[in-house]
Every structure is written in C-alpha cells, then in structure tokens.
Amino acid sequence: MIRTIGRNRILASLGLAVSLALVVGISGCRVHVDKDENGDEKKVQVDTPFGGVHVNTDQTTAADLGLPVYPGATEIKGDDKHKSADVHLGFGEWELRVRAVSYGSSDSEEKVTAFYKKALTRYGDVITCNGKSPVGTPTMTSEGLNCTDNGNNNPNVKFDNGDFNIDTGKIQLKAGSKRHQHIVGFEDPKDGQTRFALVSLDLPDVVDNKSGSSD
C-alpha cells in the first residue's frame, strides 16, 4: 500500500474516495462532509470497520504542529496550493499523519530561519538542509534523522515537498526522528514576503525484515 502525500493530490482525490466508499457500500461505512461557504470540501471523514481517512483544510495552525508563529507572520490563504491541511490515515496498525500550514513575513529569510532554528530545539537537534545535502553541523539528529530522510525512505509513503510549498532548492530545517519529523521549508519570495511552510510528519512504522527492528 503506497500513499502519495501532497495537499493538492489529497484534496483532489477526496471526491473519488467518498464516491468509492458509497459505491462499494461497505457495511459500517460512514461518510461525513462539511463544506465552506463556497461549497468546497473543508472537512471530510471516511470511516470503515478497517480504518479511515480524515482530512481537514484551512483549520490547521502552527500551534497544532507544536511550533510558534513567526512574529508578525500571516497565514497564506486564497488558493488550493497554500491551504493548510491536517491529514490522518489509519488502517489497522498502519497510521500516517501530515499537518502543514504556510506563512508569509516581511522579514528576511535569514531572520525567519534563525527564529525557527531556536524554536525547533524543543524536538532535539536541528539540522539545516539544502535539498538532500546538509549545511553545517550537525548533519544528523541524535534520533537518526538526516537530510535524505523526507518520507520517501518509507516504502509505504511518497512525500511530495512541492505540494507543501517546500522548495527542494532552498533551505530546510528539520528536527526529530525518521518517523516523527518537524520541518520548516522555504519557497521563493513573492510580493516582498518571505514564504515558508511548517510541516509535521508522523509516518507509519517500518519493520526491517532482516533485523526485525523498526525505524
């Protein structure tokens, strides 16, 4: 089972997921959809006896991710690409959660970077990455997270940075472990604003068939 994780892909596939649940007519299946004033899906829940998919859009904040908002920064809204999202998939022991929100600030990227380098220390060591390459030290957190760990190392998950407005050609800050990551990523500035995304990843457990251990 491979899940491609990206806000745009998730939001676009919600209608299909709901339709399939209704067509299949799974016993005990429950579908609940809340729409905003424009008729767009804001909250979708699909629950079955085997698990469920819960998606909330435009309701996630930095506090939900366990991070502060940069002083004076404002949430970027107004298009699908920058909608905040809280996505939870659970099927038996297979659990995945992704939360993301984008902000803009009139301050420089350097100031925002310095702020979040300090804020991320609540989750342990903080590494700085440019793409998959470390910048400075440390190059790995004490829990084993490095710049190549972006969710795609998990065979059950494909994480698309672009869908969360994280430019792989720009600086990213990371803290945590391979399974539980907090990321601050930057995109190209626009309208005089430094734009950045806050992302938390809780990835499903992966067992090493050779060692029997999990990441």
Where are these regions (language model features)?
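Bacterial N-terminal signal peptides
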Residues: 13-25
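An acidic-aromatic pocket/loop used at catalytic or ligand-binding sites
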Residues: 2, 8, 25, 29-215
